[in-house]
Regions:
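Accessory interaction regions appended to the cores of large information-processing enzymes
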Residues: 1-201
Length: 201
């Protein structure tokens, strides 16, 4: 769309950036309403099997994966081999495949499929974070299995299993300290409450 997206800690922060663009850099920008950057996550462990099969005349598609998805903390005490774990950007992938149930060359495609699925969200299409996946079994077909089949199986598998894993919407939360004269205390508390603020003391 040719848009440039600016991000900040709140509306005031964004207004200051836009003001500086106009004042210091002489950039006249059409600015839309700010959007809150939500995220999604899951809150429960779920085991799932995804069997991806397609037959269309010639060579078909086949991939079979069995995995467990859970919040990353669920795997904190994982006692398997550490070299089977890869972790980045709020996503943990544990490969427990042994004995060639899924050939080694297809494992990166499974991981890639899960990572791509995280970008599309579960409930509201916001990026998903804090998710761990433990791939523990599966099968393949000598002719019909390929990298794309396993990538698609992972995408579909995440979508189908995440719905059962108690998905939750996350929103940005900030901790602030407010100092105000006593006569304005009621107004300030009312304003904070209207914005779903939680007053601690």
């Amino acid at each position: 769309s040719g848009q440039t997206i600016i991000s900040g800690m709140g509306e005031l922060h964004l207004e200051i950036i836009v003001d500086r663009l106009k004042r210091e850099f002489k950039v006249e920008a059409n600015v839309g309403a700010p959007q809150v950057s939500y995220r999604e996550t899951i809150s429960k462990a779920v085991e799932h099997r995804e069997l991806y099969k397609k037959q269309s005349g010639g060579r078909g598609k086949f991939a079979d994966i069995q995995f467990e998805i859970a919040p990353i903390e669920y795997f904190a005490d994982y006692d398997g081999k550490k070299d089977r774990i890869s972790e980045e950007d709020g996503f943990m992938f544990i490969n427990e495949i042994v004995g060639g149930n899924i050939p080694r060359e297809f494992i990166p495609s499974v991981q890639k499929g899960f990572k791509a699925a995280l970008e599309n969200g579960i409930q509201a299409n916001y990026a998903v974070q804090n998710v761990g996946v433990r791939l523990f079994d599966g099968s393949y077909h000598d002719v019909d299995s390929d990298q794309l089949s396993f990538e698609l199986a992972a995408k579909l598998g995440f979508r189908n299993s995440a719905k059962k894993a108690k998905p939750q919407l996350l929103e940005p939360v900030m901790k602030v300290e407010v100092t105000t004269p006593e006569e304005y205390m009621g107004d300030v508390i009312g304003d904070l409450n209207s914005r779903r603020g939680i007053i601690q003391s």
